[in-house]
Amino acid sequence: MIQMQTNLDVADNSGARRVQCIKVLGGSKRKYASVGDVIVVSVKEAIPRGRVKKGDVRKAVVVRTAKEVRREDGTAIRFDRNAAVILNNNNEPMGTRIFGPVVRELRAKNFMKIISLAPEVL
């Protein structure tokens, strides 16, 4: 469950290390984002010579949350930390690699590129 001011890890090699959610997209009064939702983030920490710089405002998709995600079959999955993948203007990942596992729910939201790049899909 991601809301404004939430800090997230970045799970790709776009150059950002930490980002902060500044808006949850999908309605004017929407408060929370879960796995597969697109948010607007500000880059708080970045590596030198990366594709994004500190202070950049970008779109990102949430790939892992500490709040559990309920599934149709009754199971739930949760992670230790919140993580996101930075997106470009075409809603494709900016990086060429994804670090760590991602959840199956991204497939239903048409983030196939992230699914194919991820080392593990849970």
Curated annotation (Swiss-Prot):
The protein's GO terms of the molecular function aspect are: large ribosomal subunit rRNA binding; structural constituent of ribosome
Q: What does this protein do?
A: Binds to 23S rRNA. Forms part of two intersubunit bridges in the 70S ribosome.
Instruction: Supply the name of the protein.
Output: Large ribosomal subunit protein uL14
Write down the Pfam families for this protein, in alphabetical order: Ribosomal_L14
Q: Subunit structure, briefly?
A: Part of the 50S ribosomal subunit. Forms a cluster with proteins L3 and L19. In the 70S ribosome, L14 and L19 interact and together make contacts with the 16S rRNA in bridges B5 and B8.
The top of its lineage is: Bacteria, Pseudomonadati, Pseudomonadota, Alphaproteobacteria, Rhodobacterales
CDD domains from the UniProt entry: Ribosomal_uL14
- Which Gene Ontology terms of cellular component type are present? cytosolic large ribosomal subunit
Q: Which GO terms describe its biological process?
A: translation
Q: Does Ribonucleoprotein appear among the keywords?
A: yes
Classification via InterPro entries: Ribosomal_uL14, Ribosomal_uL14_bac-type, Ribosomal_uL14_CS, Ribosomal_uL14_sf
- SMART domains of this UniProt entry? Ribosomal_L14 (SM01374)
Family recorded in the similarity comment: Belongs to the universal ribosomal protein uL14 family.
Keyword line: Ribonucleoprotein, Ribosomal protein, RNA-binding, rRNA-binding
